[in-house]
Amino acid sequence: MSPYPHLERIGSPADLRATERRELAQVASELRAFLIESVSKTGGHLSSNLGTVELTIALHYVFNTPDDRIVWDVGHQTYGHKILTGRREAMSGLRHWGGISGFPRRCESEYDTFGTAHSSTSISAALGMAVAARDRGEDRRAIAVIGDGAMSAGMAFEALNNAGDMDANLLVILNDNEMSISPPVGALTKILARLMSGSTYNAARRVGEKVLGTVPPMAELARKVEEYAKGMIAPGTLFEEFGFHYYGPIDGHDLDALIPTLQNIRKLKGPQFLHVITKKGQGYKLAEADPILYHGVSKFDHTAGIQTGKSGGKLTYTQVFSDWLCDIAAADPRIVGITPAMREGSGLVEFAQRFPDRYYDVGIAEQHALTFAAGLACEGLKPVVAIYSTFLQRAYDQLIHDIALQNLPVVLAIDRGGLVGADGATHHGAFDLSFLACVPNLVVMAPADENECRQMLYTAVCHDGPTAVRYPRGGGSGVVPLEPMTALPIGKGEIRRHGTRIAVLAFGSMLGVALEVGEALDASVANMRFVKPLDEALIAELAANHALLVTVEENAVIGGAGSEVARFVDTLPQRPRVLRLGLPDRFIDHGDQAQLLASVGLDKTGILAAIEAVYPHNS
């Protein structure tokens, strides 16, 4: 007998809506159990998905999806949504090569109304959908589901500010699993939310507004009385000021609270705001006890749980950065560490513990993080911003206008440069070398191994100007970082192998495969180290002695390091052919990093084939 008899009968939200309401609790239980079993086999995001089981069921039960639009902020909490919308069997390939994505994708399902993965975009997107429906006279609802972390970002508040004046049928659901608002969650607030979302209350409210609106002092008094009364129970005043009708907070794991409240809200017009309280890891004691550990997981035994401890493997680049930052901070009190809500992922846990007064988590606010760092640099401190490549994209103006233009000594420690694997197109660091190389005053470095990463970080903090050190996700080549730390000469690369006819110019993580290609072709191999400034003397030397220069980078080939090499070679009197290899002009899907590199021709076989196509071995 199947352990999921109710779940297996649900192939779409229509099947869910045909389910007896009294059976929904069992559906939730089976969905949660299936999530634990499935994610333990594939890896993925677990805690956040366990925390949204009941909310997901209630939304698809009450609203007429996909005609009513649900936009999930960030999107890593949508596994339950995928299961209920016909993708239960596809979960076995979640985040794997050729399988379904770990985030919503419009091309994957009509129920994925908007692609997400970066935070704080849901309200803007849902508002656009709601306004389009309003202007076309369509009676549908747009719902944005956003977490309390994502709600802290400026873009979310920009959208709230705009939405309050739009009079569109938008529902914003705040999925609150961090704030300490436990006292208001109970029978009183459940009743209050149900009453406040009901037709009787809202009809009376509209009548009262019309009557009292004819007497301005009375209207203001009524508003203040209502605001005061609600303020004693719920933290909704802020959202009311934006022009929303606020309901909650209610228990996000209580279907008997969620469903009637959503049913009432669905009947209302204009912008509505529902505040639900959930718990990450709900229903799986190990994840409840440590939701951070179970936030993003690899395959594990769900009965025994994730086994922590030293793996004894190679250092990851994130660990190299973490060790360096603690070492340099111990020697220099001017060092401060900044992260936009990525303490664990960016390697700042130990720094935060050892130097709490010099550690700043600014929340999901990449723009603020960079300008905050610029302000610190103005006052003589040495800020180090630890940030993923994909999230640095969100702060490009601040990098140019607030840091580089003023030539401020801010260090950008850019993690996850290149292809990151299972998170896919939304998280690959595919564009950073392209958008960094054109910024004046900025020094851009890409280490080839762990030791070089440590030395480059030290070089960055010694440099009196803005710097970026861009390193890949995962482990290095096993090189042990050397002591003492030494500042590298700015803009100087090195020859790692001398050969004939062909020279391979490797940037960062591509050095290892470049050396393999060099051995196969008896080619010269250069470790370029710096994307900006380029080692023009080294390039000129290679150009004078080789018929073909091959640039290899784990970055978009358009506008990347290879483009800069080709631009310089074009100024030389002796101009060999330049073959630029990198990521193609398309978004790269998810899968194992090695699979992805092979798929875009950046493994040994692919590089050799590309060279053979333009410069046959017998030439």
UniProtKB/Swiss-Prot annotation:
Catalyzes the acyloin condensation reaction between C atoms 2 and 3 of pyruvate and glyceraldehyde 3-phosphate to yield 1-deoxy-D-xylulose-5-phosphate (DXP). Keywords: Isoprene biosynthesis, Magnesium, Metal-binding, Thiamine biosynthesis, Thiamine pyrophosphate, Transferase. This is 1-deoxy-D-xylulose-5-phosphate synthase. GO terms for cellular component: cytosol. It is an enzyme of class 2 (transferase). Binds 1 Mg(2+) ion per subunit. Binds 1 thiamine pyrophosphate per subunit. GO terms for molecular function: 1-deoxy-D-xylulose-5-phosphate synthase activity; magnesium ion binding; thiamine pyrophosphate binding. Thiamine diphosphate binds at H76, A117, H118, S119, G149, A150, N177, Y284, E366.
